[in-house]
A protein has these predicted regions:
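Cationic, low-complexity basic patches in intrinsically disordered or flexible, solvent-exposed regions
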Residues: 26
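Short loop/turn motifs at secondary-structure junctions and domain boundaries
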Residues: 87-92, 180
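Hydrophobic residues within membrane-embedded alpha helices
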Residues: 3, 10-12, 156, 165
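Glycine-biased, low-complexity coil/linker segments
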Residues: 20-22
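Acyl-donor (CoA/ACP) binding surface of acyl/acetyltransferases
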Residues: 31-67, 95, 99-212
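Conserved GNAT-fold acetyl-CoA-binding loop/helix
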Residues: 67-87
């Protein structure tokens, strides 16, 4: 039986049975591994997929909320700005929707990019957000558990980095729960709305994580 994302991708399993990890039941349907096929990871409650223009209404509403913006250090956009930004993210293929499996409604987003803290190593930088009404339900833990396994097992990264604003205690706790280690503390990392913030630096190494 194929259980890991890597095995499922190789074996082409379409309807794998659920299995338990840390008391949480997970399901994986990795339609994307290579060759340009759309990415589609399905967990117990969520789908992690490529962004679409159909996500505009939810992206504009959630992504412009004070709750999300306060830790992204970004500014509100009008509807046309949100549309252009969404189009840009779709084209760049570095951003993925966290969607409700029940109705495919976007509830958050995952972003990956080059790890600028490291040089000439197989590492990726991870960022994420979730709409306020979807927090405290375990959704981000569920989404990142699947996505991290995808990055290690399918994309074969050796290291994942994440930077979190010092006031964002909940995000730091989430990363630690997922096995990330704090590697550093960057004082006076950025200025947002005339406030200077520090960044907390985290990383997770593939050889420290047991595959799902």
């Amino acid at each position: 039986m194929c259980l890991t994302i890597k095995d499922l991708a190789l074996c082409g399993v379409q309807n794998p049975p659920p299995f338990e990890k840390g008391g949480r039941k997970l399901l994986f349907f990795p339609n994307n591994t290579s060759g340009g096929r759309p990415m589609n990871l399905v967990t117990e409650h969520l789908t992690i997929r490529e962004l679409r223009m159909e996500d505009l209404e939810q992206f504009d509403r959630l992504g412009n909320s004070d709750f999300v913006l306060q830790y992204l250090c970004m500014f509100k956009m009008d509807r046309e700005g949100s549309r252009n930004y969404l189009q840009q993210m779709i084209a760049n293929q570095k951003d993925f929707a966290i969607a409700s499996k029940e109705d495919d409604r976007l509830i958050g987003k995952i972003h990956i990019d080059k790890d600028h803290l490291r040089y000439d190593v197989n590492s990726i930088d991870l960022a994420y957000w979730l709409g306020e009404e979807y927090t405290r339900k375990g959704y981000m833990t569920e989404a990142l558990t699947a996505f991290i396994d995808y990055l290690f097992s399918v994309k074969h990264y050796d290291s994942i980095s994440a930077q979190v604003l010092a006031p964002n205690i909940a995000s730091q706790a989430l990363l630690r729960k997922l096995g990330f280690r704090q590697e550093g503390y960057l004082h006076r990392a950025l200025r947002y709305n005339d406030v200077v913030y520090d960044n907390v630096l985290f990383s997770l190494q593939r050889d420290e994580v047991a595959p799902l």
